[in-house]
A protein has these predicted regions:
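Feature captures hydrophobic
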Residues: 1-108
Length: 108
């Protein structure tokens, strides 16, 4: 079962989606904990966004962090810095696409 507060945060992001920030389909895999409800696939395209629990397809960008840190990032109470990546609080395979995710939802 999905983490209810995490699921609510992700559903809230859909209303903040800015399609003009995306020029092609980009698939993100969010690994936000160890429980099945902490893992999500987010697909963004110029025509919309979708979010489904679990891993679906091959992601262009993977973000691994805690659900708490992700929710704080979304609500603006946390601003990541380079040290957070060096310490492993946030892990990604593509920083540029991660920044594009933030822009697509008006985060930060």
């Amino acid at each position: 079962m999905a983490n209810p507060s995490l699921q609510q945060v992700l559903e809230g992001l859909q209303g903040r989606f800015r399609p003009e920030a995306i020029d092609r389909e980009i698939i993100y895999y969010l690994s936000l904990g160890e429980a099945p409800g902490d893992k999500w696939t987010v697909t963004l395209s110029p025509s919309g966004c979708s979010m489904v629990p679990g891993r679906v397809g091959t992601a262009h960008c993977v973000l691994k962090t805690s659900a708490d840190l992700f929710m704080r990032l979304v609500d603006g109470t946390y601003q990541p810095n380079a040290l957070d990546f060096m310490r492993g609080k946030l892990k990604t395979n593509d920083l540029d696409l991660l920044l594009r995710l933030r822009k697509a939802f008006g985060i930060g």
